[in-house]
């Protein structure tokens, strides 16, 4: 499933994030950008531990009330990206507008991100995370298969950073000095799931998705769900044998999750680990976004289970 480096958190030789990226032959600009995001996460995790859990009094572009931690995390990450010297454009799930940093400068990257996914879980002390998608150049409206890198940072009992640049999926952990060191390299998914994490109200599932859940249960696949996208996807990757899905619903045919901010980066990570990600009809990474707030159904995990979901949803459409 994976190649670990000693025991997690007990590596014989501590390999830090920047060194690992350099040894992997990554572009210096991309290395700098990923490391800047890692630096920003140190301030975000400190804000989670000590910050204001009250409501900020504003709404994001989806009409969702913003928590103070959402606003603070967005500000931390945005400032770090804008001053990195390697970013052309920025768009956050929490704002209405794209931020043009240096759109005409060549060799730069553009970044879409969710600064604190699952922030409503903080006050009950559940894990939350930051999700980041990176593209070359200034165009953010590209299919996910054009991503230069994707990563998430999970703020749980431990703080971990999981990334891909198209050369496998690797996990780093924040140590006592708040530096990221290698825990696992080349994380791999198995072909079939033993756990599943569903989103949305099951009574609103369409027939195909409901059949899919019943088939999982018949196969002995166990329910393991935290209510947060980042910890649930992380569980699937680290266990290597699971599936997460937030499907189309009877009252929400496009589901809930956002293509640019959540689905593309998670799909890139999952595929790089040998899994699959689909909207029930086609590969997530082939979808061309038409707007920043575009949503899509999402089935992400072990390849055979994603294919089963596609088959049952296809049959549902044929019956109609």
Swiss-Prot record:
Domain of life: Bacteria
Keyword Disulfide bond: no
Cofactors (names): Mg(2+)
CDD domains in alphabetical order: FBPase (cd00354)
Record: residues binding substrate: 117-120, 225, 256
Binding, Mg(2+) 1: 93, 114, 116
Pfam families the UniProt entry points to: FBPase (PF00316), FBPase_C (PF18913)
TM regions (residue ranges): none
Protein EC: 3.1.3.11
MF (Gene Ontology): fructose 1,6-bisphosphate 1-phosphatase activity; magnesium ion binding
Quaternary data: Homotetramer.
Protein name: Fructose-1,6-bisphosphatase class 1
Source species of the chain: Syntrophotalea carbinolica (strain DSM 2380 / NBRC 103641 / GraBd1)
Gene: fbp
């Amino acid at each position: 499933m994976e190649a670990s480096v000693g025991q997690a958190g007990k590596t014989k030789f501590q390999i830090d994030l920047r060194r690992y990226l350099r040894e992997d032959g990554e572009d210096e600009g991309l290395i700098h950008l990923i490391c800047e995001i890692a630096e920003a996460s140190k301030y975000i995790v400190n804000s989670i531990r000590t910050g204001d859990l009250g409501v900020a009094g504003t709404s994001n572009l989806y009409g969702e009330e913003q928590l103070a931690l959402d606003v603070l995390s967005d500000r931390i990450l945005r400032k770090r990206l804008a001053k990195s010297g390697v970013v052309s454009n920025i768009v956050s799930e929490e704002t209405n507008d794209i931020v043009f940093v240096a759109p005409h400068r060549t060799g730069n990257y553009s970044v879409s991100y969710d600064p604190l996914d699952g922030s409503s879980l903080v006050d009950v002390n559940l894990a939350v995370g930051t999700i980041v998608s990176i593209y070359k150049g200034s165009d953010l409206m590209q299919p996910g298969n054009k991503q230069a890198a994707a990563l998430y940072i999970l703020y749980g009992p431990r703080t971990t950073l999981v990334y891909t640049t198209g050369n496998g999926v690797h996990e780093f952990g924040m140590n006592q000095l708040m530096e990221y060191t290698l825990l696992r390299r080349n994380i791999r998914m198995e072909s079939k799931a033993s756990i599943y994490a569903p989103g949305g109200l099951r009574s609103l599932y369409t027939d195909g998705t409901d059949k899919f859940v019943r088939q999982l249960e018949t196969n002995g696949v166990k329910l393991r769900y935290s209510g947060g996208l980042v910890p649930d996807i992380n569980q699937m990757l680290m266990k290597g044998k699971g599936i997460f899905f937030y499907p189309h619903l009877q009252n929400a045919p496009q589901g809930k999750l956002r293509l640019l901010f959540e689905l593309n980066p998670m799909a890139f990570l999952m595929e790089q680990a040998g899994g699959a990600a689909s909207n029930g009809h086609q590969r997530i990474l082939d979808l061309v976004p038409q707007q920043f707030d575009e949503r899509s159904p999402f089935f992400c995990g072990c390849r055979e289970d994603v294919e089963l979901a596609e088959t049952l949803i296809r049959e549902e459409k044929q019956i109609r």
